C-alpha cells in the first residue's frame, strides 16, 4: 500500500522508471561507465554486466506468481528499482576492481567468462520452466539474447587477440613473379641441354632413313613442317581476339600500324647498321695508322756448293747489286730501290737460321763449323756481319743403340729419320742510316781442311728475319684487335649520341601524342 501511495503521489517518478525499465539492452551498455585505461576488452565487461542484470531479472521472474506481456505492477517496479540500484553499485565496484587489477592474467578472465556462461545457462532453465507464464515474443527474445551472449563468451574464451600486420600483396606478387621467372629459366636451360643431346641422334637417324627410304622421309618431313606451321599459326591467332576480326576497319588499322612499325624498325636498323659500319671503317683506319707491323721474312736457303764456302742470298728489298760488290755502275733498278727503306731505322733484327743435318759419320767427325751472315746494301757493300759456330749434338754409342732399339719400327717404316735440326739465333744488328737491301749467308770452311772440305752435309736450311719494335709500338701491335674493338665501339657510341642530339628525326620517328592535355588541346608539337 505504501508503494502504491508513493507511486500515485509521484507520477513523474513512475513514468521515468517505466521508461528506464522498458529501454533496450543497448541503453544499459551506453550508460555504463567504462574506463579507457583498462586492459580488459569492453565486450567482456559488457557481457559480465549484462549477465548480472539477467540474473536479477530471472530471480524476479521466479518470485512473482504471474506475469503479463503488457506491463508490470507498481510493486514489481519498485523491486526493479532496488535491483537497478544494486546493479549500479556493482558497476561502480567492477570499475574499481578493473582499475586495480591490471596485472591479472587472462586465465582469470576466462574463468569469469565460464561463470557467466553457467549463469546464463541457469537463465535458460528458468525461462524454460516458466514458459507457460511468459509471452512467446518475450521468450523468443530472451532466448536469443542468451544464446548470442553464450556464443560471444565462447568466442572470446577460445580466442586470444592477435595483432598481425596485413601482408603486402605487391611484395608477394613481385616475389612470386621472380620465382616463376627463375623456374622458367631453369626449365628452358634443361630443355635446351636435352635438345642438344637428342638432336645429333635424331639427325643421324633421319639421314639414314633418307638414304634407305627417301620418299617416306620426305613425306615425314612435310608432315612435320605442316604441323609446326599449324601450331605457330594457332598460337598467333589464339592471342588475337576473334571478335575484333569482325570489324574490318579496325583490322585494317591494326595491319597498317603493324606495317608502319615494321617499316620504321627496318629504317632504324639500317641507320644503326650504317653507323656501325662507318665506326668499324674509321677504327680500322686508325689502327692501321698507329700500329706498325714488324718486318718478317721467311726464306728457304739454297747454298752454292761450287764455292769453297757455300753461300746463299735472302733479299730484303733487292739483291741486284750483290755481284758488283761496289765496282759496277748503278743500274736503273738500283736507283729505284736506293731510297727505299724496308726495315725502319733504329730497329733490331732477330735472325733465326735452321739447318737439318744427317747424323752421318762425316758430320760427326767434322765437329765444329761456322756460319756467317752479311748485311749488304743496295750496291753490294757489306754493312755488318754476324758469325756463330755450331756442331751436332753429341750422343754416346750406348745411348745411340738404346734409342735405335726403341725406334726400330719407325726407322724401318720411314716415319723417323736419323737427323738433327740445328737452330741458330743471330742477334745484335741494329738498322742504321744505310738501309739493308740483302742478306748473305755463308758456311765457312774449316782452316785445317783442304779447299772444298770441312763443310757439313745439309738436308735443307731456312732463314727467318723479324724486326723488333719499340716497347709501346710492340704493345699496340700485340693488342691491335682489342684496340680495334674498343675504338670502333667508342666511335659508334659517339656517332649514335651525335645523331640523337643533332639529327634526332633521322633515327627516331615523330609520333603523335595519344592523350591531349588541356594546356595543349590541339595536340600540336612544340
Swiss-Prot record:
InterPro entries: Seipin. PANTHER family: BERNARDINELLI-SEIP CONGENITAL LIPODYSTROPHY 2 HOMOLOG BSCL2 PROTEIN, SEIPIN. GO terms for biological process: lipid droplet formation; lipid droplet organization; lipid metabolic process; pollen germination; regulation of double fertilization forming a zygote and endosperm; seed dormancy process. Involved in lipid metabolism and lipid droplet (LD) morphology, number, and size. Supports the formation of small-sized LDs and modulates triacylglycerol accumulation. Induces probably a reorganization of the endoplasmic reticulum into LD-forming domains. Belongs to the seipin family. Keywords: Endoplasmic reticulum, Lipid metabolism, Membrane, Transmembrane, Transmembrane helix. Expressed in seeds, seedlings, leaves, stems and roots. Not detected in flowers. The chain crosses the membrane at residues 195-215, 224-243, 258-278, 483-503. Its main location: endoplasmic reticulum. One of its GO terms (cellular component) is endoplasmic reticulum. It comes from the Eukaryota. Residues 33-77 are annotated as: Disordered. Residues 58-70 have a biased composition (Low complexity). The gene is SEI2. It is a multi-pass membrane protein. It is found in: Endoplasmic reticulum membrane. It comes from Arabidopsis thaliana. This is Seipin-2.
Amino acid at each position: 500500500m505504501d508503494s502504491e501511495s508513493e507511486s500515485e503521489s509521484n507520477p513523474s517518478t513512475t513514468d521515468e522508471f517505466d521508461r528506464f525499465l522498458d529501454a533496450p539492452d543497448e541503453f544499459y551498455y551506453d550508460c555504463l561507465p567504462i574506463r579507457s585505461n583498462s586492459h580488459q576488452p569492453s565486450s567482456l565487461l559488457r557481457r559480465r554486466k549484462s549477465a548480472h542484470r539477467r540474473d536479477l531479472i530471472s530471480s524476479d521472474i521466479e518470485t512473482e506468481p504471474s506475469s503479463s506481456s503488457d506491463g508490470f505492477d507498481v510493486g514489481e517496479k519498485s523491486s526493479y528499482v532496488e535491483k537497478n540500484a544494486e546493479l549500479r553499485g556493482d558497476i561502480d565496484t567492477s570499475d574499481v576492481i578493473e582499475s586495480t587489477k591490471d596485472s591479472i592474467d587472462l586465465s582469470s578472465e576466462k574463468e569469469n567468462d565460464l561463470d557467466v556462461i553457467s549463469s546464463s545457462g541457469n537463465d535458460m532453465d528458468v525461462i524454460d520452466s516458466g514458459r507457460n507464464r511468459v509471452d512467446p515474443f518475450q521468450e523468443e527474445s530472451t532466448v536469443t539474447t542468451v544464446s548470442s551472449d553464450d556464443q560471444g563468451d565462447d568466442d572470446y574464451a577460445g580466442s586470444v587477440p592477435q595483432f598481425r600486420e596485413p601482408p603486402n600483396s605487391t611484395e608477394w606478387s613481385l616475389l612470386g613473379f621472380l620465382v616463376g621467372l627463375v623456374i622458367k629459366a631453369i626449365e628452358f636451360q634443361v630443355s635446351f641441354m636435352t635438345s642438344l643431346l637428342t638432336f645429333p641422334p635424331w639427325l643421324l637417324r633421319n639421314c639414314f632413313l633418307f638414304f634407305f627410304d627417301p620418299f617416306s622421309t620426305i613425306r615425314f618431313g612435310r608432315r612435320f613442317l605442316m604441323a609446326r606451321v599449324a601450331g605457330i599459326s594457332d598460337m598467333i591467332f589464339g592471342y588475337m581476339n576473334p571478335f575484333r576480326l569482325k570489324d574490318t576497319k579496325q583490322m585494317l588499322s591494326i595491319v597498317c600500324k603493324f606495317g608502319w612499325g615494321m617499316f620504321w624498325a627496318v629504317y632504324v636498323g639500317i641507320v644503326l647498321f650504317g653507323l656501325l659500319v662507318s665506326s668499324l671503317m674509321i677504327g680500322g683506319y686508325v689502327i692501321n695508322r698507329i700500329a706498325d707491323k714488324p718486318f718478317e721474312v721467311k726464306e728457304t736457303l739454297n747454298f752454292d756448293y761450287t764455292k769453297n764456302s757455300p753461300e746463299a742470298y735472302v733479299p730484303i728489298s733487292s739483291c741486284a747489286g750483290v755481284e758488283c760488290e761496289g765496282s759496277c755502275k748503278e743500274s736503273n733498278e738500283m736507283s729505284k730501290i736506293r731510297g727505299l727503306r724496308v726495315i725502319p731505322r733504329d730497329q733490331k733484327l732477330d735472325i733465326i737460321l735452321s739447318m737439318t743435318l744427317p747424323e752421318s759419320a762425316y758430320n760427326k767427325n767434322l765437329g765444329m763449323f761456322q756460319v756467317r751472315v752479311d748485311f749488304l746494301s743496295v750496291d753490294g757493300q757489306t754493312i755488318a756481319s754476324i758469325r756463330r759456330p755450331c756442331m751436332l749434338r753429341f750422343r754416346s754409342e750406348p745411348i745411340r743403340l738404346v734409342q735405335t732399339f726403341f725406334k726400330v719400327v719407325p726407322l724401318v717404316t720411314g716415319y723417323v729419320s736419323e737427323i738433327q735440326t740445328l737452330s741458330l739465333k743471330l742477334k745484335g744488328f741494329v738498322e742504321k742510316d744505310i738501309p739493308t737491301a740483302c742478306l748473305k749467308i755463308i758456311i765457312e770452311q774449316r782452316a785445317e781442311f783442304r779447299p772444298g772440305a770441312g763443310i757439313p752435309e745439309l738436308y735443307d736450311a731456312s732463314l727467318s728475319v723479324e724486326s723488333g719494335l719499340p716497347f709501346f709500338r710492340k704493345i699496340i701491335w700485340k693488342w691491335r684487335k682489342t684496340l680495334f674493338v674498343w675504338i670502333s665501339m667508342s666511335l659508334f657510341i659517339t656517332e649514335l649520341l651525335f645523331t640523337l642530339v643533332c639529327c634526332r628525326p633521322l633515327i627516331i620517328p615523330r609520333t603523335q601524342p595519344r592523350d591531349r592535355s588541356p594546356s595543349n588541346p590541339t595536340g600540336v608539337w612544340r
